[in-house]
């Protein structure tokens, strides 16, 4: 007669089998693998769907397991001293290795606690597919967050992408599913098969994957990022103490896929090839930093990288993670800083990625008024969810700490700050106090910047923020968001609007030139002419310029030199320096052939020389964020469309004069004092740049009857910037 204990055991046993066979088991390790058995023995249980026969290696001998269920459950009774490393099983790929279900968890209680609180700042070591040595055995540990899933399985090359074979176990109440697979190696392709509460089985790429297949394929790949031998230790150490505010910062904004192609065709250059070519180019051209449009994995070329599917994976378009590490290392060895565009505000709706990851609104808000962006047709992160903010903050730290990137430019911050951004009146939900500010996003940004500055001192956090939100670059302690720098979108828009006007009528728009100085020191600004200004029918910078061809090139020289002279750090998007006529096209390389023509060679030489000039002039960068660095000489000459001011740094003073019309002034008087000597040291109208060559070889100093200096008499070249050294 069967005892109650035996009946209970049989019931639990059958329940285990049912859940394994139907792939709905939360704890497959509780049944599969190595377990204590009756009379001091142990039992190994194996699951091979529909298999008729299974062999395993036990203490060096091949033995056959007994099938105990027709769907493919097997067991083998073994001695009590058997351990996880005393037997091996055959995987579907035919390889013999240790049993995944005989190992302890790799995602521990501390991991669960920190993740639940949103403060697991080294989460990138624990989540996703990672090469690991666990209990002395090499393999790959997998962990994925899917709290609302009925079950999660690992599907990969080694198990022939069969979602029944390798169910994962959930770790407590964390929502994290885990599995360690011994013997797996670098290059293994994998995904997660998630059984949703709605009964669907969906296939998802790993949100924490370090590498991915080349689009359009979407599988994640196991990568080794520990093997690379970094040689930039001195750079990383110096970065911690670098006072970047008082140093030159001249950023070259680059889209890797279209900066240059192989042999003038559509094939991409590798990260290693790009490292050598871009480094040599930036050193020659006088750029101190490279800012890359997003290189995190993304499915669509035309998104330019701003719709990210793999936040931890350098895109495979240009090589492997190790190639990207080489890229960063090489830049640092040649004293060039690297900034990445980073997109924590939204993500694409592609079914293989983060969207409705476990069948529910997991990374995004459920309500489309909060969780869907109508302009970009993307999902918006739920910043108030600890696990989501942790995913993003750990991602920022991953790029800055592990991949040695020097800074992040946070994309579309305005869309994060405001709940009504891009929405009509009834398309958004007010915050808890009835306002339009996204309080959760604001708190996320403060948390992000605080942790980055704490853990990665010297790293730059830059905001692309297009509104007048107060305190973007103010410290968190003083109520700000804590960014280091902010793109000066207002100055950029005013400047480009002014330059688009007919030159003889610019006097009616003089305010566009001077208004930016009203707020120039309210934040720490970067003056930018970015990729956004040369696409979607906006024309290239050169094509925006009015006038005949000579005037267009002169205007472009004036535009760039005007930016160089203004307070703030600098950024220029690729292509402007060669005078590209066409808009930027992400599918083709820059039109380098233009440099064979004198006009384009002239603008190229101009950018090269003014960049190097900038680097040598502390007055143009040493006190960028202080009123002390700038003094108006004349901002009111609307009639002639001329402005003049002095830039200061240390003991140096530079007089900058800009003539925004094509008119030549042979006798232009400026009222200026407190100097005894003046020398023209840069002129954008130089013949070598394609200009008319109107120089001030010996500017006349005007004195009063007491022989005190009261002004200057200058020659003003047409459409030109003139820079003088005062002493």
From Swiss-Prot:
Coiled coil: none annotated. The lineage of its organism: Bacteria, Pseudomonadati, Chlamydiota, Chlamydiia, Parachlamydiales. This is 1,4-alpha-glucan branching enzyme GlgB. The keyword Glycosyltransferase applies. One of its GO terms (biological process) is glycogen biosynthetic process. Monomer. InterPro entries: A-amylase/branching_C, Branching_enzy, GlgB, GlgB_N, GlgB_N_E_set_prok, Glyco_hydro_13_cat_dom, Glyco_hydro_13_N, Glyco_hydro_b. Keywords: Carbohydrate metabolism, Glycogen biosynthesis, Glycogen metabolism, Glycosyltransferase, Transferase. It catalyses: Transfers a segment of a (1->4)-alpha-D-glucan chain to a primary hydroxy group in a similar glucan chain. The active site is at 411 (nucleophile), 464 (proton donor). Its EC number is 2.4.1.18. Pathway: Glycan biosynthesis; glycogen biosynthesis. Belongs to the glycosyl hydrolase 13 family. GlgB subfamily. One of its GO terms (molecular function) is hydrolase activity, hydrolyzing O-glycosyl compounds. The keyword Glycosyltransferase applies. Signal peptide: none annotated. Catalyzes the formation of the alpha-1,6-glucosidic linkages in glycogen by scission of a 1,4-alpha-linked oligosaccharide from growing alpha-1,4-glucan chains and the subsequent attachment of the oligosaccharide to the alpha-1,6 position. GO terms for cellular component: cytosol.
């Amino acid at each position: 007669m069967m005892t109650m204990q035996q009946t209970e055991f049989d019931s639990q046993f059958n329940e285990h089998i049912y859940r394994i066979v139907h792939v709905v088991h939360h704890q497959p390790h509780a049944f599969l693998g190595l377990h204590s058995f009756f009379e001091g023995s142990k039992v190994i249980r194996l699951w091979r769907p529909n298999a008729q026969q299974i062999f395993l290696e036990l203490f060096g001998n091949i033995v056959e397991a007994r099938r105990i269920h027709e769907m493919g459950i097997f067991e083998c009774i073994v001695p009590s001293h058997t351990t996880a490393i005393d037997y091996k099983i055959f995987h579907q790929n035919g390889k013999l290795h240790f049993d995944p279900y005989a190992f302890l968890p790799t995602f521990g209680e501390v991991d669960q606690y920190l993740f639940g609180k949103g403060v697991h700042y080294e989460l990138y070591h624990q989540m996703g597919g990672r090469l690991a040595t666990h209990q002395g055995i090499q393999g790959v540990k997998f962990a994925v967050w899917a709290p609302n899933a009925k079950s999660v399985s690992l599907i990969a090359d080694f198990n022939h992408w069969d979602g029944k074979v390798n169910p994962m176990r959930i770790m407590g109440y964390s929502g994290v599913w885990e599995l360690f697979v011994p013997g797996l190696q670098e290059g293994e392709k994998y995904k997660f098969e998630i059984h949703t509460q709605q009964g669907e089985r969906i296939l998802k790429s790993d949100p924490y994957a370090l590498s991915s297949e080349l689009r359009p394929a979407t599988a994640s790949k196991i990568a080794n990022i520990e093997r690379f031998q970094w040689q930039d230790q001195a750079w990383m150490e110096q970065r911690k103490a670098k006072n970047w505010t008082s140093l030159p910062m001249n950023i070259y904004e680059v889209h890797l896929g279209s900066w240059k192609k192989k042999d003038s065709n559509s094939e991409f250059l590798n990260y290693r090839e790009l490292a050598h070519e871009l480094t040599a180019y930036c050193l020659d051209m006088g750029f101190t930093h490279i800012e890359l449009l997003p290189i995190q994995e993304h499915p669509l070329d035309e998104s330019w990288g701003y719709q990210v599917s793999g936040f931890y994976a350098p895109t495979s378009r240009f090589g492997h993670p190790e190639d990207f590490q080489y890229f960063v290392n090489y830049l640092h060895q040649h004293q060039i800083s690297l900034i990445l565009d980073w997109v924590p505000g939204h993500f694409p709706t592609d079914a293989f990625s983060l969207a409705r990851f476990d069948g529910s609104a997991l990374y995004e808000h459920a309500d489309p008024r909060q969780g869907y962006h109508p302009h970009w047709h993307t999902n918006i992160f739920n910043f108030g969810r600890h696990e989501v903010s942790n995913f993003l903050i750990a991602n920022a730290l991953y790029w800055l700490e592990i991949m040695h990137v020097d800074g992040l430019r946070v994309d579309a911050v305005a869309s994060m700050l405001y709940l009504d951004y891009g929405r009509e009146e009834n398309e958004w939900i007010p915050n808890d106090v009835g306002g339009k500010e996204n309080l959760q996003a604001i708190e996320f940004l403060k948390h992000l910047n605080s942790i980055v500055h704490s853990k990665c001192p010297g790293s730059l956090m830059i905001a692309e923020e297009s509104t007048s939100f107060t305190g973007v670059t103010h410290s968190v302690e003083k109520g700000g968001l804590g960014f280091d720098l902010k793109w000066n979108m207002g100055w950029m828009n005013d400047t480009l609007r002014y330059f688009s006007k007919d030159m003889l009528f610019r006097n009616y728009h003089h305010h566009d030139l001077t208004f930016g100085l009203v707020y120039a020191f309210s934040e720490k600004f970067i003056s930018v002419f970015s990729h956004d200004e040369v696409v979607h029918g906006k024309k290239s910078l050169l094509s925006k310029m009015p006038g005949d061809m000579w005037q267009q090139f002169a205007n472009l020289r004036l535009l760039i030199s005007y930016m160089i002279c203004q307070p703030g750090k600098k950024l220029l998007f690729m292509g402007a320096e060669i005078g590209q006529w066409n808009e930027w096209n992400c599918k083709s390389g820059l039109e380098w052939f233009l440099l064979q023509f004198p006009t384009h060679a002239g603008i190229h030489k101009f950018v090269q020389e003014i960049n190097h000039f900038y680097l040598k002039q502390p007055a143009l960068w040493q006190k960028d964020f202080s009123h002390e660095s700038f003094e108006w000489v004349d901002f009111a000459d609307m009639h002639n469309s001329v402005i003049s001011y002095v830039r200061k740094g240390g003991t140096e003073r530079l007089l900058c004069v800009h003539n925004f019309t094509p008119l030549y002034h042979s006798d232009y008087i400026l009222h200026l004092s407190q100097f005894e000597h003046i020398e023209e040291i840069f002129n954008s109208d130089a013949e070598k740049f394609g200009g008319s060559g109107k120089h001030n070889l010996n500017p006349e100093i005007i004195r009063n009857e007491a022989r005190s200096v009261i002004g200057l008499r200058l020659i003003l070249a047409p459409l030109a910037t003139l820079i003088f050294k005062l002493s």
